[in-house]
């Protein structure tokens, strides 16, 4: 709610036009009630669809068939299914799942791993490699295991995509990597569950998957009205639309707590510690850092070679003696063995 209220303020007070562009448009207008009687979402008035005949366009762009299987599978079972196909992308919910499936794929042809356990420079290089391999007919087998990082803003096209169960918006984003350029009459996106290994943890991911499971069985997932219904299902189960209690800090004109609100607000909840890894010329930059100290241009360059880990995993790496604090609050992975050229940062003790 506070984010939408900020956009409404820009619109009403400053005359700003806000353009929402996504293949999985959330419901941002009207009044929606949550499970708590006091939890109401007050949306933006007068949102106008700028694409004419939206429903006809969605029909025209149907290039993918969805195959849904909600029965719990193991890593081995999913890896075996993925290995049936030569050009295939499999997207999972966590970095751990990506590593487990990657390790189980057969070592034939090209197999690649994409997750935030790779530093940004490594991710960019791998995405460029994927694009080149998909165009190169001399490499008939290209299998990629990835996390959600490929679901938005990454222009890759596979004839077959696998997507672990999640919210409808994520599934349709994954389907957008399938038969993207219409080379085939129809592509196939398989939706699968890893519940035989573990249940989806409680939280936003669980809520999103439950909202999808509560859609009518005969729903057409590509129909824009189904996406609207999905978001209603998601919102109506919420206890609050203001998780960080921004209303308490910013909505009382007699007591505006901007500093506290700034500290508490996070667009994306993230308790990660950043570690500089040994990739490319990162260690040369670290030596410059030791010699010259912290400068903005240098830190901007080093940001391309960092991996974020949760505090518990950070403590684990410290206990292995794998991390050095080169300057206050700046950490470097000194053990080269802890960063794999295929799967990135390893949290195991080598």
Regions found by a protein language model. Give the residues of each.
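SF2 helicase catalytic motif II
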Residues: 1-10
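C-terminal helicase lobe and adjacent C-terminal extensions/tails of nucleic-acid helicase motors
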Residues: 11, 76-85, 91, 96, ...
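SF2 helicase motor core recognition
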Residues: 142-158, 173-181
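Conserved helicase ATPase core of P-loop NTP-dependent helicases/translocases
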Residues: 119-147
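Amphipathic coiled-coil/heptad-repeat helices and related helical stalk/stem segments
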Residues: 3, 74-75, 126, 146
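A short beta-strand-to-loop transition that corresponds to the Sensor-1 phosphate-sensing loop
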Residues: 21-26, 92-95, 146-149, 165
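Loop/turn-to-beta-strand initiation segments
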Residues: 13-19, 87, 140-143
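Interdomain hinge/linker at the junction between the two RecA-like core domains of SF2 helicases
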Residues: 9, 13, 17, 23-83
